[in-house]
């Protein structure tokens, strides 16, 4: 039972993101450094209102750079009532900016200047400047409290801009210096503004008001909105229920802009979109609400007109009717084909299908046109094709895309080479270390040490500081969020004992990338928890395996003909798990072990069977699993009873309990206080079963074994509520919905996993403690629902990121109705962020024993 080779966890999160992405820009992953710290923004594109000296010029205002005198410093002290000093960055093209990082002037310990606050002004064309405001109208952002730390601030809402000015703010006269970085990505939509009627208010039957205005629109707002961008381009799609929102601390209806039918005299809402250049449009995607029970539906048809530069609107429109949906109230993206029409402006008329129409996002799929075409359809005689030799369309976006594609190809080739090289050496090592079994099925194991490393060394060689990529990728921690590498490098801290006993995906030391010499955070790997027969595998550290390898294990051979197969419990890639009845098992079991069955009665057993066509690696893994299972001797752990290995298929025979697994057992029962005549379970019985689970896990942790899939589905129930921990719940189709599958290979029980297991691939006894807390929660809810049943798999991973950041936004499982405060307090202690602050299984077991005696 050892870990199977892993894939980078980043691929999981990227797959989740790519699989669910609907918008052109996803703010959760659009968090790349744009080139201040890496040097990709040239000095001439960094300007300032003034400078103290040549050594504190604007070009020295780069995050993590110590060049010059260590930062940009304005000529005079900043006054609270005279905010005229600024640092300006020209990004050359429009960018979607989601995050700002700032530092003061450290200068090797000689600098003390920093900006405690700042404002942001931005422009898309260099002439009209806009003051950034958050969702509540506040303009001032928190800055630094010392000259050396990097302070990262999310822009909520994000901005679309080419020019950005950072304006230092103080509450008293003081000298300030700044080093900055902007984070985001290229704005591929090319949209520079949209004009639309102002959103309206929806009054619920109870009198509550839902504000459906575009609250972050950065243009002029009156009865209509002109020359700006806002919520329709912020990359955030609204929920099915428009009264709910993704965002924190905002009002109901924030995600949507909505209009009432009676406000439109012609039965439609007209929105005009202006773009940065003439573009070739493929599709338009509109995210609409369809909560028809409240009179909200998607539009029934749309007509779009096109215009190139300053010409008139073309008479030929794109018309697209829709089939209305009165069955599914889910919000959805509506894709409108635009038939490769060319234009720099589009005017669309969205026709009402009901009382209300609500949009949360509008995106366009397009490419920059390589020549000026009127955009009319070829068959239209009313709009002849023209060509203006004086017009040159800037194709910088195209060059950037080509460069990115070439870079991606080289990266993929490098990854393939690394994977092949790793597999080659893995096979060589396996051949060198694998031993053959003797006639008594003796297995000797010596596994390489598995540990996690976090490179906090900031020094780097000159060769390591060279970077040719335009952007250094900040890998996502969840589908909707990622932290820049400069920040998260400091965060994970684990006690030495946990690192020694942990079983994790091997985390490679981070390699510095970029002139700043700051190492990227070490990438975690996906750990495949499945064994060859489909069940989860225990994680056994190298120290423990070295102790086991010195002992010969003789396992009794069981006559295969005595196995009476009843049903298949589950299956894996190379084997199956069957429920069988056997007679005469007493002759083959250990003398110190008593079967939980009456004399001369058939015994229920679980038989793990390896298929005859399994490869050599699978056979060795199966035999290693027998080696480990044979050492587990505890009243609350499933025992290995016998094996069948004289011929194929190889089998191992383990205990099974007459009441099946705890999940099914509890779901068939009700609390004792219930008035129902159905089977009941008392609170004392629940506590008794939980205590046994803790006892079994205490035994495993004493051996430094990590279960990695502790849940009620992996706890078997015998007579008198006895519990034994098993390991084949993962193989059962019945519980396939409890696991998230990645690329058809690894399956992860993410709803039971700790944040460090999901994000760092790290499995320790502390991560088993987390899973025990979830198992305890299942027990006291009588397994009536899945943990976090209200969240999708992507949202569960998103919540994991909240545990990582620890900003008070994480969602905990609620206290079950039958659960006393003392037990729920125990659950919460199992879900503490820091692994060293979680209780041990010895402490948990003792606490449950004490509570049971009260």
From Swiss-Prot:
Write out the ranges of the annotated region (Disordered): 452-471
Question: Per the UniProt record, which residue ranges are transmembrane?
Answer: 400-421
- Ranges of compositional bias, category Low complexity: 455-469
Q: How is it modified after translation?
A: N-glycosylated. Tyrosine phosphorylated in response to collagen binding. Phosphorylated by SRC; this is required for activation and subsequent autophosphorylation on additional tyrosine residues.
Which catalysed reactions does the entry list for this protein?
A: L-tyrosyl-[protein] + ATP = O-phospho-L-tyrosyl-[protein] + ADP + H(+)
By its UniProt entry, which SUPFAM superfamilies does this protein fall under? Galactose-binding domain-like, Protein kinase-like (PK-like)
Could you tell me what this protein is called?
Discoidin domain-containing receptor 2
Subunit-level organization: Binds hydroxyproline-rich sequence motifs in fibrillar, glycosylated collagen, such as the GQOGVMGFO motif, where O stands for hydroxyproline. Interacts with SRC. Interacts (tyrosine phosphorylated) with SHC1.
| Ways its activity is controlled | Present in an inactive state in the absence of collagen binding and phosphorylation by SRC. Tyrosine phosphorylation enhances the affinity for ATP and the catalytic activity.
| Cleaved signal peptide residues | 1-21
- What is expression of this protein induced or repressed by? Up-regulated during osteoblast differentiation (in vitro). Up-regulated in cartilage from mice with osteoarthritis.
Keyword vocabulary terms for this entry: ATP-binding, Cell membrane, Disulfide bond, Glycoprotein, Kinase, Membrane, Nucleotide-binding, Osteogenesis, Phosphoprotein, Receptor, Signal, Transferase, Transmembrane, Transmembrane helix, Tyrosine-protein kinase
Q: What is its EC number?
A: 2.7.10.1
Covalent S-S links between cysteines: 30-185, 73-177
Q: State if Transferase is listed as a keyword.
A: yes
- Name the residues annotated as catalytic in the UniProt entry: 709
Phylogenetic placement of the source organism: Eukaryota, Metazoa, Chordata, Craniata, Vertebrata
Query: Which enzyme class, named as a word?
Result: transferase
Q: Where in the cell is it found?
A: Cell membrane
Q: Which organism is it from?
A: Mus musculus (Mouse)
InterPro entries hit by this protein: DDR1-2_DS-like, FA58C, Galactose-bd-like_sf, Kinase-like_dom_sf, Prot_kinase_dom, RTK, Ser-Thr/Tyr_kinase_cat_dom, Tyr_kinase_AS
Pull the Extracellular topological domain ranges from the record.
Answer: 22-399
Q: Which Pfam families does the record associate with it?
A: DDR1-2_DS-like, F5_F8_type_C, PK_Tyr_Ser-Thr
- Which disease is reported for it? Defects in Ddr2 are the cause of the smallie (sli) phenotype. Smallie mice show distinct dwarfing, with reduced body mass and reduced bone mineral content. Mice also have mild craniofacial deformities, such as protuberant eyes and snub noses. Smallie mice have a reduced life span, with about half of them dying within 6 months. Matings between male and female smallie mice do not yield any offspring. The levels of circulating steroid hormones remain at a level corresponding to prepubertal wild-type mice.
